[in-house]
């Protein structure tokens, strides 16, 4: 839902630390002047403006929940500027939901105004985009199948509650692991902080960043707690975080 949460006046929602002000989670990959966005959140327009995004070459979707797809219509300026359709990569299930949710984009009714121009690509294994090998990493978001993505020595896994051993095998030798850690209390569709730490113990990335963070977790105090618990290599991600990835 983002932080601050509407109608909430808790300590984190009232925090003056800009790192406690969180839009919905998304990632921008930049390689050799080309860019890929993972998930077009409801905050996509503001996120793109914040980083000065002027070119978009592809979109990857982890799954089709509202907080990950509802910024889809805001890709139109990139179509107009680049005079090209954008490739979209997602699972068959996610593509089906996109077609249903944004029916005006995909039906055959003539559009009165501009609509997003895309080409759809169902993910069924590793693929290449902007000169980078993308490895899909299947996981479970409650009863729902979702995809994480590995690119070089980094991986991004948001919105998941469990991950099979076959997917864990795809995550060996990581420099950076970005993973779901919603809060301390159990949730049927997300990892807790302790579950995320257990996966960090198992996979042993050089660094780990927690994302999809609810308003129960304050940035500075949670990071201090992680250090005290013996995890100096783990921290909460924050809006605007950027780092280089070894491909």
Question: What do these predicted regions represent?
Answer:
Residues 44, 163-164:
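Short, surface-exposed beta-strand-loop junctions and turns on beta-sheet-rich folds
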Residues 136-137, 157-159, 179-180, 211:
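Thr-Gly-centered strand-to-loop micro-motif
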Residues 1-157, 223-246:
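Binuclear metal-dependent hydrolase catalytic cores
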Residues 164-247:
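Binuclear metal-ion centers of metallo-dependent hydrolases, dominated by the metallo-beta-lactamase
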């Amino acid at each position: 839902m983002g932080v601050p949460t509407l109608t909430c006046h808790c300590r984190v929602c009232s925090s003056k630390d800009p790192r406690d002000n969180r839009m919905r989670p998304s990632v921008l990959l930049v390689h050799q002047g080309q860019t890929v966005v993972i998930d077009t959140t409801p905050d996509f327009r503001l996120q793109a403006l914040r980083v000065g995004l002027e070119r978009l070459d592809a979109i990857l979707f982890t799954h089709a929940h509202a907080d990950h797809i509802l910024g889809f219509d805001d890709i139109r300026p990139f179509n107009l500027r680049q005079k090209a359709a954008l490739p979209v990569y997602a699972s068959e299930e996610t593509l089906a939901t996109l077609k249903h949710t944004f029916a005006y984009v995909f039906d055959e009714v003539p559009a009165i105004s501009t609509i997003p121009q895309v080409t759809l690509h169902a993910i069924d294994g590793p693929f290449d985009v902007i000169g980078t090998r993308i490895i899909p990493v299947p996981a479970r978001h409650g009863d729902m199948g979702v995809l994480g993505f590995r690119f070089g020595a980094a991986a991004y896994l948001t919105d998941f509650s469990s991950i099979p051993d076959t997917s864990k095998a795809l995550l060996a030798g990581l420099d950076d692991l970005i993973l779901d850690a919603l809060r301390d209390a159990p949730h049927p569709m997300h990892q807790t902080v302790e579950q995320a730490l257990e996966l960090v113990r198992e996979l042993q990335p050089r660094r780990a960043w927690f994302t999809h963070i609810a308003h129960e977790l304050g940035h500075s105090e949670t990071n201090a707690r992680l250090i005290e618990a013996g995890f100096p290599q783990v921290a909460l991600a924050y809006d605007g975080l950027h780092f280089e990835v070894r491909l």
